[in-house]
């Protein structure tokens, strides 16, 4: 919005040309989201307290968490508000990638809001049924996957439609341009052609998987939000470089016209996340709930697909990956041993992994900060793939 206004008056007011620089708008999107989050945070917390939107804590979880019962949840709505306002103010509203990321983010946020609402109203920690939640996530994820399969390969929406029609006319067997291939880090020229169906399947897996992975990680005060900020900031840098023909050619990464605007969304996400951390740091005054965790995870996955860095997301989001695997392995092993011996056994003391370390005697703050440190190292390693080729 501000970009449009600046371009309209820049001939009369020369300094307004600074709005044409993406980096300038990214910085101020970050500051805007941070300011919105810090200003409205206390109001949102008081409102949630009045509405008695308190977290229902699992009785079979760590006993130290029972004291958290009643802490306001659904604070992720504050994050989405800050991201949405800052993005709409500072981004180029004609950019199609910004809109698809916003739609996915708000869509997953809506699913999370319904889940949180049911938890609060019915005092049920499980919330929405898994099948129902997965169904809505799948609808949103598939919508994004089909759209991105062709928009990543086309520099404009008109060419996107031409590409889509050509795919239909080919009997759904058309190949995509090389820029839509799966990029293998550390190699300049090695990539894996996905085809349309492969691209859709991978994109669906990345978006829905990342959304649920962030949600599983969000079990301790500040645990999920800081890794989200770090990974999101790194993806913003990838977006900026991918959107530049010069940098993309120099670094041997695909050039996706228009992807650079996503650094503004990533900046807004970082600012909103830091503002939320102000209130979510131990002892937390508010939890983000599924409305925040599902939305932020969906945003990270969508951006990674657009900038063609799915494998790098897997590296940088290693904490999210390990947390998810810990749950899958725990459940699978329990079912397997119960089927074989009649008694289910567990590999971990408790899943997800952060609860295992709590049961081992780690303080909550120790688990959180150590996971932050691990994420920081993984993000730096992921960024190193830009030059280690």
From Swiss-Prot:
Which GO MF terms does the UniProt record name?
metal ion binding; phospho-N-acetylmuramoyl-pentapeptide-transferase activity; UDP-N-acetylmuramoyl-L-alanyl-D-glutamyl-meso-2,6-diaminopimelyl-D-alanyl-D-alanine:undecaprenyl-phosphate transferase activity
Q: Which cofactor does it need?
A: Mg(2+)
User: Which EC numbers characterise this protein's activity in its record?
Assistant: 2.7.8.13
Catalysed reactions listed for this entry: UDP-N-acetyl-alpha-D-muramoyl-L-alanyl-gamma-D-glutamyl-meso-2,6-diaminopimeloyl-D-alanyl-D-alanine + di-trans,octa-cis-undecaprenyl phosphate = di-trans,octa-cis-undecaprenyl diphospho-N-acetyl-alpha-D-muramoyl-L-alanyl-D-glutamyl-meso-2,6-diaminopimeloyl-D-alanyl-D-alanine + UMP
Give the stretches traversing the membrane. 21-41, 70-90, 97-117, 134-154, 189-209, 222-242, 259-279, 286-306, 311-331, 366-386
Query: Keywords, A to Z?
Result: Cell cycle, Cell division, Cell inner membrane, Cell membrane, Cell shape, Cell wall biogenesis/degradation, Magnesium, Membrane, Metal-binding, Peptidoglycan synthesis, Transferase, Transmembrane, Transmembrane helix
Q: Which GO terms describe its cellular component?
A: plasma membrane
Specify whether Ion transport is a keyword of the entry.
Answer: no
Q: Which GO terms describe its biological process?
A: cell division; cell wall organization; peptidoglycan biosynthetic process; regulation of cell shape
Q: Where in the cell is it found?
A: Cell inner membrane
Topological relation to the membrane, as annotated: Multi-pass membrane protein
- Extract the InterPro entries matched here: Glycosyl_transferase_4, PNAcMuramoyl-5peptid_Trfase, PNAcMuramoyl-5peptid_Trfase_CS
- Cell division among the record's keywords? yes
Major location (coarse):
membrane
**Pathway annotation from the record:** Cell wall biogenesis; peptidoglycan biosynthesis
UniProt cross-references to CDD domains, sorted A to Z: GT_MraY (cd06852)
Pfam families (alphabetical) = Glycos_transf_4 (PF00953), MraY_sig1 (PF10555)
What job does the chain carry out?
Catalyzes the initial step of the lipid cycle reactions in the biosynthesis of the cell wall peptidoglycan: transfers peptidoglycan precursor phospho-MurNAc-pentapeptide from UDP-MurNAc-pentapeptide onto the lipid carrier undecaprenyl phosphate, yielding undecaprenyl-pyrophosphoryl-MurNAc-pentapeptide, known as lipid I.
Give the HAMAP family listed for this entry: MraY
Family the entry assigns: Belongs to the glycosyltransferase 4 family. MraY subfamily.
Query: Could you identify this protein by its name?
Result: Phospho-N-acetylmuramoyl-pentapeptide-transferase
Taxonomy of origin reads: Bacteria, Pseudomonadati, Pseudomonadota, Betaproteobacteria, Burkholderiales
